[in-house]
């Protein structure tokens, strides 16, 4: 499937339910031992943790949206990464969307983030902590040129390279999605230490943030992991294909309805949503 078709499918998936979804009616985590259920784009979570809003190492954006819930492994990853960043004097980590209290489908903006194992992190590290007003209405820093072929040199900082590398080297991380131009710059800057680049995957948009995805926890038996990324650093022909013009004759895919929920997620909805 060509890149344009994939982009359209992703857009349709993320906007298939712009009306409020039943998952938004669940305002607190579902009690129980932490269990990520289903796939990243069709699942839910029992026993989610709440990311502490107050931290000296990170700040949480758009708290009014209440998307700061996730599997305990995700909360620990955020705390671990932000502590590393702080200890290196790199700045404050800005945390975007995680998931809703019980996971599940958003009403727009995300096709994934459903099992409590995804988090968006801004690709900027302010030295001065943001105000409450800035956090509620954050201003993203677009690192990619208008033509989409490279990063803006005046905005690309060594600290951003280090932030992505630190995240990719974490034992629980399986994928990090960034814009192809950002992946390209990482390839240029990486030097001989390149194993971590395998986890960094080019994807549409993602011009101002990285989308970090964790592996399924070992005790979440109903969690569906993705296959591992292809071997290698991903800096060759695969990456360059993202910069090629779309092939002629590309057609818009038909709008698809969301797939059925995993049975455990449907049972959760039936029990907790009136």
From Swiss-Prot:
Transmembrane segments: none
Annotated residues for binding of Zn(2+) 1: 110, 113, 120, 211
Location within or outside the cell: Periplasm
InterPro entries membership: Hedgehog_sig/DD-Pept_Zn-bd_sf, Peptidase_M74
Cofactor: Zn(2+)
GO biological process: peptidoglycan metabolic process; proteolysis
Region ranges (Disordered): 227-274
Cofactor note: Binds 2 Zn(2+) ions per subunit. Zn(2+) ion 1 is bound in the active site. Zn(2+) ion 2 is bound at the dimer interface by residues from both subunits.
Gene Ontology MF, one: metalloendopeptidase activity
Keywords carried by this UniProt record: Disulfide bond, Hydrolase, Metal-binding, Metalloprotease, Periplasm, Protease, Signal, Zinc
Cystine pairs: 44-265, 187-235, 216-223
Source organism, top-level taxon: Bacteria
Signal peptide segment: 1-19
Pfam family, one: Peptidase_M74
EC number: 3.4.24.-
Residues engaged in binding Zn(2+) 2: 147, 150
GO CC, alphabetical: outer membrane-bounded periplasmic space
NCBIfam families per the UniProt record, alphabetical: PRK09429.1 (NF006947)
Subunit structure: Dimer.
UniProt record similarity statement: Belongs to the peptidase M74 family.
Purpose: Murein endopeptidase that cleaves the D-alanyl-meso-2,6-diamino-pimelyl amide bond that connects peptidoglycan strands. Likely plays a role in the removal of murein from the sacculus.
HAMAP family: MepA
Protein name, per record: Penicillin-insensitive murein endopeptidase
Gene name, Swiss-Prot/TrEMBL: mepA
């Amino acid at each position: 499937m060509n890149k344009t078709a994939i982009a359209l499918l992703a857009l349709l998936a993320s906007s298939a339910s712009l009306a409020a979804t039943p998952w938004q009616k669940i305002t607190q985590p579902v009690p129980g031992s932490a269990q990520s259920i289903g796939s990243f784009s069709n699942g839910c979570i029992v026993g989610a943790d709440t990311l502490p809003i107050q931290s000296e190492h990170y700040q949480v954006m758009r708290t009014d949206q209440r998307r700061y819930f996730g599997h305990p492994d995700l909360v620990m990853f955020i705390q671990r990464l932000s502590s590393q960043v702080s200890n290196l004097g790199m700045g404050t980590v800005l945390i975007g969307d995680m998931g809703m209290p019980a996971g599940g489908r958003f009403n727009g903006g995300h096709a994934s983030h459903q099992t409590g194992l995804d988090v968006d992190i801004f690709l900027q590290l302010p030295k001065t902590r943001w105000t409450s007003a800035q956090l509620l209405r954050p201003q993203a820093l677009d690192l990619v040129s208008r033509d989409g072929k490279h990063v803006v040199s005046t905005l690309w900082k060594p600290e951003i390279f280090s932030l992505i590398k630190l995240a990719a080297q974490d034992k629980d991380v399986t994928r990090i999605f960034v814009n192809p131009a950002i992946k390209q710059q990482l390839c240029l800057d990486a030097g001989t230490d390149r194993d971590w680049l395998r986890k960094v995957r080019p994807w549409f948009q993602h011009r101002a943030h990285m989308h970090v995805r964790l592996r399924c926890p070992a005790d979440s038996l109903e969690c569906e992991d993705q296959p591992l990324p292809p071997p290698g650093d991903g800096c060759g022909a695969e990456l360059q294909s993202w910069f090629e013009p779309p092939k002629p004759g590309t057609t818009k895919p038909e709008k698809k309805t969301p797939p059925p929920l995993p049975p455990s997620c449907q049972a959760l909805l039936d029990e907790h949503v009136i």
